[in-house]
Structures are given as C-alpha cells and as structure tokens.
Amino acid sequence: MNPTLILAAFCLGIASATLTFDHSLEAQWTKWKAMHNRLYGMNEEGWRRAVWEKNMKMIELHNQEYREGKHSFTMAMNAFGDMTSEEFRQVMNGFQNRKPRKGKVFQEPLFYEAPRSVDWREKGYVTPVKNQGQCGSCWAFSATGALEGQMFRKTGRLISLSEQNLVDCSGPQGNEGCNGGLMDYAFQYVQDNGGLDSEESYPYEATEESCKYNPKYSVANDTGFVDIPKQEKALMKAVATVGPISVAIDAGHESFLFYKEGIYFEPDCSSEDMDHGVLVVGYGFESTESDNNKYWLVKNSWGEEWGMGGYVKMAKDRRNHCGIASAASYPTV
C-alpha cells in the first residue's frame, strides 16, 4: 500500500495590491458570502474572492461544455467556493491509504446474478446525509453508514451511530481523528470495544476530543469485517447481497468538489491513490443500460447541499473509476 498521504498547504502567491475582480459577479459574491456566513479580515477577503471567482468561472466553463455534450455531469457553486482544492484536501479528505488489509475475504455467491439496479435507501437501510464539517473524519462516516445498514439488516431498527465516538476513541486501532483514518480500523475498534454509542447520546463535534464512550448508550456492535476483492464485479455482488458498503475514492479534484448531478467521470481520477471514505448504497443506470451510463449510488458526508442531496452517481464498470472498488469493506454483525 502507499504511504500515508501527506498534504501540503497551497500558497496562492497573489499580492493583494494586484488583484482585479469581475464586477459583474459582485451581487453573486455578496449573496454567497451571506448564504455561507463568511466574514473575512481586510487582508483575506481579496484573495478569497479571487479563489471564488476562479472556481465560479471554472464551473461555468464546465457546464457550458456539458451542454455541448463533453461531460456527463454538471457542477455548481457551493460552500467550498472560497477554498483551493489543495486546502480542501488538507482539511476535508481523511482516508489514509496505507496499510495491508486484514479482514476476512468476501466470497462471491456462486451462480448468483446480481440485479441490474439496487437502492438500499428504499429498503430503510440508510440514515439521512450527514456533514463532517472541517474535519478529516470521512472514514468515520463511511464506517457508521455501513454498520447502520448491517444493524438494520439484523434488528429491523435504523439508528444513527456516533461518528464522534470513533473520532475520539479509535486511536489505539490506528485512526487519527480529524487527521484521517481507515474504515477497517473503525470496525476493529467497535469489535474490540464491545459496542458503539448512538449519535443522539454522543453527538458529532467536528473535532477530536477525549473518549467519552458509555456502554449504557451502545446500540451497535460487530464481530469483525470483510474486505472485498478489488473488482467492480465483486463489489456489485456485495452491494446486492449485503447492503451498503464502505469504499474509498480519489476525491481530490475540483470536478468532484463542485459536483452537482449526473454521472461523475473524471479522466484524471486515480484507481490507487484514494483520499476519501464514502458509502455505496446502490447502483443503477440512466436511460438504457450501456457502458457509459451505469453508476454507483454513493452517499457522501458533506451535507445535503452538496451534489444530489448529498449523493453522487459515480461512473460504474469503467476500469474501477476513482478506485471505488480498491478498498471496499463492511462489518459483520
């Protein structure tokens, strides 16, 4: 596996005295700042606006090319508009692609033909979209999502689980709170600890604090975890037969940061260098089934305003696009 991803801060190198702005965007900039409660210091506002304008024009160009048939998805300005992609990766993406896998190996069911489409939201397996905030805890949200689904499968009750419990307490298993972690380490913590508290009893704070796990409020447990072979065919069978699956993807692209809707396909996406943990809750296709219109239905942890109500359709069966099948796993309960 690759060593821990080390992200460096990005230096804009823009002197405030030389900044020039597109005055036709003045009203949109003012509205965006108000919508997202942005208050800047005198020296910061200029270069933040420069970043925002650069992102806005990149989005407009992409959407124009979409209308010309050059892309399969649209983009939109969102809460990340004043951040560079380098800043965003440093703060938000927290999957650490570094260790050999130690779970049981998923055994594909023999003679099983997976359905053409699956959506576990329709079966009650999936909690509402959550928001990790400015904390590299994506791994915790991916892990709770998979465990929430398996607990529902076992008990018939869907209970939101505590990401904060994982952020604060799974350090001994190898996780690093807001600085990143692995879903398998989270599953290992739950097994070692003998339980995981509910979201209601141990709410999310978007910062690492001292461990406050209380067995009185534990509502989930697992007996280990299963790692899925690095093939989309195996992932498809796992999603169809097991439920929502934790996966990691390469999300380090502006196209993903500002994704709005459609099937996400990024030519520069890596199938090996993943930096973001998410949850596959199904798969399907748009219009008629063909090579370029199949997708994985993926739950993100950036709030409901991002993407399609917090979800993204990732290109499916296109050479393991963005590494979606490279680190897939789920807990056993």
Curated annotation (Swiss-Prot):
Disulphide bonds in the chain: C135-C178, C169-C211, C269-C322
Domain of life of the native organism: Eukaryota
Binding site for Zn(2+) 3: D184, D227
Residues binding Zn(2+) 1: E122
Processing after translation: During export along the endocytic pathway, pro-CTSL undergoes several proteolytic cleavages to generate the CTSL single-chain and two-chain mature forms, composed of a heavy chain linked to a light chain by disulfide bonds. Autocleavage; produces the single-chain CTSL after cleavage of the propeptide. The cleavage can be intermolecular.
Binding site for Zn(2+) 5: D250, H253
Field pH dependence: Optimum pH is 5.5, also active at pH 7.0 with CUX1 as substrate.
Residues annotated to bind Zn(2+) 7: D275
Catalytic reaction list: Specificity close to that of papain. As compared to cathepsin B, cathepsin L exhibits higher activity toward protein substrates, but has little activity on Z-Arg-Arg-NHMec, and no peptidyl-dipeptidase activity
Propeptide section residues: 18-113, 289-291
Subcellular location: Lysosome; Apical cell membrane; Cytoplasmic vesicle, Secretory vesicle, Chromaffin granule; Secreted, Extracellular space
Glycosylation sites recorded in the entry for this protein: N221
Presence of the UniProt keyword Glycoprotein in the record: yes
Binding site for Zn(2+) 2: E163, E199
Keywords assigned by UniProt, alphabetized: Cell membrane, Cytoplasmic vesicle, Disulfide bond, Glycoprotein, Host-virus interaction, Hydrolase, Lysosome, Membrane, Nucleus, Protease, Secreted, Signal, Thiol protease, Zymogen
GO biological-process terms attached to the record: adaptive immune response; antigen processing and presentation; antigen processing and presentation of exogenous peptide antigen via MHC class II; antigen processing and presentation of peptide antigen; CD4-positive, alpha-beta T cell lineage commitment; cellular response to thyroid hormone stimulus; collagen catabolic process; elastin catabolic process
Residues with site note (Cleavage): F106, Q107, E108, Y112, E113, A114
SUPFAM superfamilies tied to this protein: Cysteine proteinases
One Pfam family from the record: Peptidase_C1
Main EC class the enzyme belongs to: hydrolase
Family according to the record: Belongs to the peptidase C1 family.
Function in brief: Thiol protease important for the overall degradation of proteins in lysosomes. Plays a critical for normal cellular functions such as general protein turnover, antigen processing and bone remodeling. Involved in the solubilization of cross-linked TG/thyroglobulin and in the subsequent release of thyroid hormone thyroxine (T4) by limited proteolysis of TG/thyroglobulin in the thyroid follicle lumen. In neuroendocrine chromaffin cells secretory vesicles, catalyzes the prohormone proenkephalin processing to the active enkephalin peptide neurotransmitter.
Record text on subunit structure and interactions: Dimer of a heavy and a light chain linked by disulfide bonds. Interacts with Long isoform of CD74/Ii chain; the interaction stabilizes the conformation of mature CTSL.
Name of protein: Procathepsin L
Source species of the chain: Homo sapiens (Human)
Gene that this sequence comes from: CTSL
